[in-house]
Swiss-Prot record:
Low complexity bias locations: 43-53, 188-199
GO biological process: maintenance of shoot apical meristem identity; mRNA transcription; organ boundary specification between lateral organs and the meristem; petal development; post-embryonic plant morphogenesis; specification of petal number
Pfam families: ALOG_dom (PF04852)
Molecular-function GO term, any one: DNA binding
PANTHER family in the cross-refs: PROTEIN G1-LIKE2 (PTHR31165), PROTEIN LIGHT-DEPENDENT SHORT HYPOCOTYLS 3 (PTHR31165:SF95)
Keyword presence, Cell inner membrane: no
Cross-referenced InterPro entries: ALOG, ALOG_dom
Record protein name field: Protein LIGHT-DEPENDENT SHORT HYPOCOTYLS 3
Gene name, Swiss-Prot/TrEMBL: LSH3
Keyword Transcription: yes
Residue interval(s) of motif Nuclear localization signal: 179-183
Taxonomic placement: Eukaryota, Viridiplantae, Streptophyta, Embryophyta, Tracheophyta
Length: 219
C-alpha cells in the first residue's frame, strides 16, 4: 500500500489531476461519508440558500475532477467499472497535495497538538477533508444515475480506510475527532411533575421534532 502513492506521483497517468478545489478546506459541506461534521461551518450570517449553493458548486467541481481522474487513468476507466479499490487509489494520490502535518511514531512531536518546532514529517490530506469529499462524491454518483448498491464511494473498503485515517491522524496529531456530547440541564422540581404527566399522554418525540410531524416512508 505504501508503494501506491509513490508510483502514482511518478506516473504520467495521473499528471493531469491537480485540481485542488476538490479538497478545499473552506468547503461548505458539513456532512461527510461517516456522517460527521468534516469541515468548518459557515458563519451564522450565511443564508441557507447560499450554503446550499456553495455545497452544490463544490460537489459539481469534485465530480468533474473525479471524471478527469478516470479519463487520465491508464488504462482509462469508465464510471461503470470504477470500484472501491479505484476510490482508495484516488484518495492516496491526493495525499501529495495535502497540507496537514501528520507525525510519524518516531517523531518527538508524535501526539503533540501544537508542536513547538518544525519537523520532517510528511504532509497529508486531513481526515476531515477526505471524509467530506467522499460524502459529496457519494451523493453526486447517485444524482448522476448511479445505483446506491453499486456506489463505489460507499464501499466498505472506503469506509474502513477513512476510519483508519481518522484514528491514525487523531493519535499522530494529538487531536480528537469525537463529537462532544452536550449535557442536558436537569429539570427543575416545578417542571418535573408536569413533564411526568405529559409523558403518559404522548409518545416520546425525537429531538428536533414536534407533535405535528408526520411519518414518511422512504421509497
Amino acid at each position: 500500500m505504501d508503494m501506491i502513492p509513490q508510483l502514482m506521483e511518478g506516473s504520467s497517468a495521473y499528471g493531469g489531476v491537480t485540481n485542488l478545489n476538490i479538497i478545499s478546506n473552506n468547503s461548505s459541506s458539513v456532512t461527510g461519508a461517516t456522517g460527521g461534521e468534516a469541515t468548518q461551518p459557515l458563519s451564522s450570517s450565511s443564508s441557507p440558500s447560499a450554503n446550499s449553493s456553495r455545497y452544490e458548486n463544490q460537489k459539481r467541481r469534485d465530480w468533474n475532477t473525479f471524471g478527469q481522474y478516470l479519463r487520465n487513468h491508464r488504462p482509462p476507466l469508465s464510471l461503470s467499472r470504477c470500484s472501491g479499490a479505484h476510490v482508495l487509489e484516488f484518495l492516496r494520490y491526493l495525499d501529495q497535495f495535502g497540507k496537514t502535518k501528520v507525525h510519524t511514531n518516531i517523531c518527538h512531536f508524535y501526539g503533540h497538538p501544537n508542536p513547538p518546532a518544525p519537523c520532517p514529517c510528511p504532509l497529508r490530506q486531513a481526515w476531515g477533508s477526505l471524509d467530506a469529499l467522499i460524502g459529496r462524491l457519494r451523493a453526486a454518483f447517485e444524482e448522476n444515475g448511479g445505483k446506491p448498491e453499486t456506489n463505489p464511494f460507499g464501499a466498505r473498503a472506503v469506509r474502513l480506510y477513512l476510519r483508519e485515517v481518522r484514528d491514525m491522524q487523531s493519535k499522530a496529531r494529538g487531536v480528537s475527532y469525537e463529537k462532544k456530547k452536550r449535557k442536558r440541564p436537569l429539570p427543575s422540581s416545578s417542571t418535573s411533575s408536569s413533564s411526568a404527566v405529559a409523558s403518559h399522554q404522548q409518545f416520546q418525540m425525537l429531538p428536533g421534532t414536534s407533535s405535528t410531524t408526520q411519518l414518511k416512508f422512504e421509497k
